[in-house]
Amino acid sequence: MDSKRSLLFMALLFISFLIYQQWQVDYNTPKPEVTEQAQVSEVNSTALTATSDIANDTQAKGRVITLENDVFRLKVNTLGGDVIGSELLNYDAELHSSAPFVLLQNNADKVYIAQSGLVGKNGIDSRAGRANYQVEGDVFKLAEGQQELKVPLIFEKDGVIYRKVFVLKPGSYALEVNFEITNQSPKPIELVPYAQLTHTLVESSGSMAMPTYTGGAYSSSETNYKKYSFEDMEKADLDIHTKAGWVALLQHYFVSAWIPNQDANNTLYTLTNTKKHLGSIGYRSAPIVIENGATETIHTQLWTGPKLQDQMADVANHLDLTVDYGWAWFIAKPLFKLLTLIQSLVQNWGLAIIGVTLVVKAVLYPLTKAQYTSMAKMRMLQPKLQEMRERFGEDRQRMSQEMMKLYKEEKVNPLGGCLPILLQMPIFIALYWTFMEAVELRHAPFFGWVQDLSAQDPYFILPILMGASMFLLQKMSPTPVADPMQQKVMTFMPLIFMVFFLFFPAGLVLYWLASNLITIAQQWLIYRGLEKKGLHTRVKK
């Protein structure tokens, strides 16, 4: 296999990967699993309170207050204490926009809110009505140097004082939402905490070049991470009993997640309202009995922000898996750490991509050298192989036996040119997902005209350069392709790939371009060594 065939093989593998990926998105939606049962202690029937009791009014009319730290600004409705809006202050809505990115919102075009409350026998957040909390003030902002901001919302009913306390910390997208309940009534009360994320039902968007997922996900004691799409929600309600865990709604680069008390028994659930075109994913905990004169505190957290892996891993187990690298995660994670390390040194994500490419190509150089050496040896055997074809003609069995004998005598592996490529493909796929999933590349500039590595090149310069580098790689091939049809395919391959990559993120095209240029340099170096060994002769074209 000469280098032209290697290039074709690599291209076909890559295209096959993209087609398979898109097919998975479009047609291979798995049947929802709704009966996962974790090992939890027995809970009484009240713990399984029907989710139909949970309030799902997204248009509750209450006073709206603002909570803010240095990374986000939240809108909270005092009727129920739901978070109905979030602005991410360090992320622009669009490139070069002065407006912050809006994640949670509640308007005529889109509903995406984080609800929480107390249901059960003595619940205050049923469909019959929500708790109307009182709070002094409208705007609460974490001051510079302040380590924590607590904002208590207070509601009293039948001798019970309910305090819903929001806790903000500097630099954190994790919001603590704690219930402090003091029972001053003469009887014990029973409550079931719940929290859910409600979103307008939508389909995952994107393209073959940049697929994106918008939908639910969850983690339980038996499943570290699993997606549960809006389509799944419409087919069957999720109903998983587990200890710990979390529920989330994902979109490209951003996530909102409710994390309950990790020591409690919880039921993860979904709800859909087809009339209002809404879907919810949430959890409800085991019932809590509060005796008269007692006070109980219920802890929960809401993450609403970018997919920052290190921070999310500190908030909850496996929450960082929402940065979904697919099956290549074990390669992608260290590659991402390498990418961030290089970026911290060079202070440019484009240069960091080139740096990662250099490191990867250096690590793979022994495989690359073995590939070209094997191909060179195969070329040296071509006259003998052609002679065998002519001698044995239709006797394919004899010809195969003689060929294998020749390979053994010459110590040549006929698959030596393919195997290194197959071994490199998982690394390329891991890099692909690393660049696709990293929110750090969103609106990250390289230089000049490339101001957003997560978007396509606005002037298509990088794809054109990438196509030219592929053409140059072809021209460096030591032998022409004999088959006319294959020759035509190879002639148009750089053009096909150039058109294909017009719609890819600039960061991924930059990686491919850098990889091609490094391959050209490595190929030149390897061929020089092979010439000295008499295994390669330059062909004038």
Swiss-Prot record:
Pfam families assigned to the protein according to its UniProt record, in alphabetical order: 60KD_IMP (PF02096), YidC_periplas (PF14849)
GO BP term, example: protein transport
Keywords, sorted A to Z: Cell inner membrane, Cell membrane, Chaperone, Membrane, Protein transport, Transmembrane, Transmembrane helix, Transport
Family matches, as Gene3D superfamilies: 2.70.98.90
Single GO term (MF): membrane insertase activity
Similarity remark: Belongs to the OXA1/ALB3/YidC family. Type 1 subfamily.
Physiological role: Required for the insertion and/or proper folding and/or complex formation of integral membrane proteins into the membrane. Involved in integration of membrane proteins that insert both dependently and independently of the Sec translocase complex, as well as at least some lipoproteins. Aids folding of multispanning membrane proteins.
Protein name: Membrane protein insertase YidC
Gene source species: Histophilus somni (strain 2336) (Haemophilus somnus)
